[in-house]
UniProtKB/Swiss-Prot annotation:
GO biological process: autophagy of mitochondrion; cellular response to nitrogen starvation; pexophagy; piecemeal microautophagy of the nucleus; positive regulation of autophagosome assembly; positive regulation of autophagosome size; protein localization to phagophore assembly site
Family to which this protein belongs: Belongs to the ATG17 family.
Function, as annotated: Autophagy-specific protein that functions in response to autophagy-inducing signals as a scaffold to recruit other ATG proteins to organize pre-autophagosomal structure (PAS) formation. Modulates the timing and magnitude of the autophagy response, such as the size of the sequestering vesicles. Plays particularly a role in pexophagy and nucleophagy.
Pfam families tied to this protein: ATG17_like
UniProt KW keywords: Autophagy, Coiled coil, Cytoplasm, Membrane
Membrane topology type: Peripheral membrane protein
Major subcellular site: cytoplasm
Protein species of origin: Vanderwaltozyma polyspora (strain ATCC 22028 / DSM 70294 / BCRC 21397 / CBS 2163 / NBRC 10782 / NRRL Y-8283 / UCD 57-17)
Name this protein carries in UniProt: Autophagy-related protein 17
Upper taxonomic lineage: Eukaryota, Fungi, Dikarya, Ascomycota, Saccharomycotina
Localization per Swiss-Prot or TrEMBL: Cytoplasm; Preautophagosomal structure membrane
GO MF terms held by the record: molecular adaptor activity; protein kinase activator activity; SNARE binding
Length: 413
């Protein structure tokens, strides 16, 4: 009967100890889970801050400084368009107009009508697009005005990104994060090291107490199965008696340890709640900076749109320059062709004169031969005409018409 009391008392104590330890461990686990979730959130914030830092540096140095200021505004727009392209426009505008003036100054000697509009070579060339480059040159000041405005917007944006967004807004969030969430913070040390270590120690104490109570219960159950005559009965009974006398003290220590766990958790959760509020504030500040980055991204799209307009202007100018260059080459070849035409006319005149001289010489030689032929015919008739009947060679014997006929025409050049 006495042994059964030991068993019942140890069972009751074990159940109570298990409930106390389980509840305490559950509260510790919940606190750890909340803190683990918080640590992941902090890691995410740390990651986002590093991303924003890198993105800010990329926007400032690569996109704004190098991409927009150096490559786009200074090289592509200012140098390439306002200087190089304007120089090309002026050169070819002067070139085409000078070429037309040259054609206007060359008299068309082939036109004998003094009142004709085609008295000079300029009459034969189109003047519809001669002023196209002049028009493009007149657009350059307007393009320069827009580029200057863009440069002003760029300077404003660069200062905003550098001085306000990076050096002020982002830096303030970084400093807030470092002050409140890095390991050298007192509260962070308590949450990551001091209090967790204490909770682990208390968990070990609870485990030891529960192990002692469980061991006492197991020994009580074993004693219940033994008989007084068994060899181990007396020694085990003495152990169970001694442990039973200490049972209340162990339970008291266990309860005190549970209370200490709760006090530690209270301190832990108090600090954690404060740090969680700071995390929410940090999130608020962080997402404010992210919104600023989005706004600046929209500003960058404006540069892209303006760049497209200026690129279209440049492409149009280059196309007009190429057309004007081709026109200049055509006009130069027209001038050369006209000079070659004059040479060709002289060559043809020379050929025509040679032909005329040859034909005149031919006529003279034929005339001489014909005179000789006429004499020979007369002599023939004197000697033979009276003896030959006419019908032996009808219409031919006494025919004194020339043996040749010569018809020709030479074009007047």
């Amino acid at each position: 009967m006495k042994i059964e009391r030991f068993v019942n008392a140890s069972r009751k104590t074990l159940v109570e100890a298990q409930v106390l330890c389980q509840d305490a461990n559950s509260r510790i686990s919940n606190a750890r889970s909340s803190f683990s979730h918080w640590e992941r959130s902090i890691s995410k914030i740390r990651f986002l801050l590093n991303c924003l830092k890198n993105q800010g540096s990329f926007i400032k140095n690569c996109i704004l400084k190098v991409g927009i200021e150096e490559n786009l505004i200074e090289k592509e727009w200012t140098q390439s368009i306002l200087v190089d392209l304007a120089k090309e426009l002026k050169y070819w505008n002067s070139k085409i107009n000078e070429q037309v003036r040259v054609l206007d100054s060359i008299e068309n000697i082939l036109d004998e009508d003094t009142k004709s509009e085609s008295k000079n070579l300029g009459y034969f060339v189109s003047r519809d697009n001669l002023d196209i480059l002049e028009k493009r040159l007149k657009e350059i000041p307007n393009v320069k005005y827009h580029i200057d405005n863009i440069r002003g917007q760029y300077n404003t944006m660069f200062k905003k990104v550098s001085n306000y967004l990076i050096n002020k807004r982002l830096k303030s969030v970084q400093e807030y994060f470092l002050t409140n969430f890095e390991n050298d913070s007192d509260d962070i040390k308590k949450l990551t090291t001091t209090l967790p270590s204490k909770l682990v120690s208390l968990e070990h104490d609870l485990a030891d107490y529960l192990s002692s109570i469980t061991n006492h219960y197991d020994q009580s159950k074993l004693l219940q199965t033994l008989k007084p005559a068994d060899p181990d009965y007396t020694d085990l009974l003495e152990v169970v008696k001694n442990d039973n006398s200490e049972l209340d003290g162990i339970v008291t220590l266990l309860r005190e340890t549970v209370d200490e766990v709760d006090e530690t958790l209270k301190t832990f959760l108090g600090i954690f709640n404060e740090i969680e509020l700071k995390q929410k504030e940090c999130n608020k500040l962080l997402f404010g900076v992210i919104e600023e980055f989005k706004i600046n991204h929209e500003y960058l799209l404006i540069f892209n749109d303006i760049s497209s307009l200026i690129d279209n202007f440049k492409e149009t100018c280059i196309e007009d320059i190429n057309n004007t260059r081709s026109l200049c080459i055509f006009y130069q070849k027209f001038e050369i062709g006209y000079q070659n035409l004059l040479f060709e006319i002289e060559r043809r005149k020379t050929v025509a004169q040679k032909m005329t001289d040859i034909i005149k010489n031919c006529e003279l030689e034929l005339s001489k031969i014909n005179e000789e032929d006429q004499k020979n015919r007369s002599e023939f008739l004197k000697l033979n005409g009276d003896y030959l009947p006419e019908n032996i060679w009808p219409g031919k014997i006494d025919d004194f018409s020339p043996l040749y006929s010569l018809e020709y025409s030479i074009k007047e050049i």
